[in-house]
Amino acid sequence: MGTWAVGPFGNDFAQDWAQDLQESKDLYFIEDTLNNVLQAETTEYLEAPFGAEALAAVETWSRLQGKGGAKDEDSAGVDEWVADVQAKLSKPRADIADKAHRVLTLVLSEASELRELWEDSEHYEDWRATVTDLQRRLSA
């Protein structure tokens, strides 16, 4: 995985996901990503690409709720998409919020390859802090 930052959009998988998001005009793509990741709750292992996409999806959901993290060049495409779609959303969906929380728990768990890869790097604590900040923002 090409990674250049600990943020949710600082890797190739997340950037590819964000590119695909541009084709969507509603919450379907975000929810589909979360549903795919949650299948790992039963398969016992979450592979890194799905973990990276999950973080991108949850951060995008967070931005739609007005609880987004820092904007930067890595998030620019997502930020444009959020600005276009946000006004069209009728109300927050508790089911997606619940899925987002479950996904973050899974990404941080022992069953996450993404967590394992970050654990083997010198930036693990920074990455973990980024994910726990996202959890905090979702809960606010």
Regions found by a protein language model. Give the residues of each.
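Short, extreme N-terminal segment that most often corresponds to the first beta-strand
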Residues: 1-21
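Residue-level signature of the C-terminal ends
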Residues: 20, 24, 64-67, 107
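Short amphipathic alpha-helical segments and their helix-coil junctions
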Residues: 24-46
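Residue-level detector of well-ordered alpha-helical segments, enriched
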Residues: 29, 33, 49-56, 99
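Helix-start/N-cap signature of alpha-helical segments
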Residues: 46-50, 93
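Short, hydrophobic/amphipathic alpha-helical patches that form generic packing surfaces
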Residues: 52-66
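Short, solvent-exposed secondary-structure capping/transition elements
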Residues: 63-77
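Low-complexity intrinsically disordered segments
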Residues: 92-140
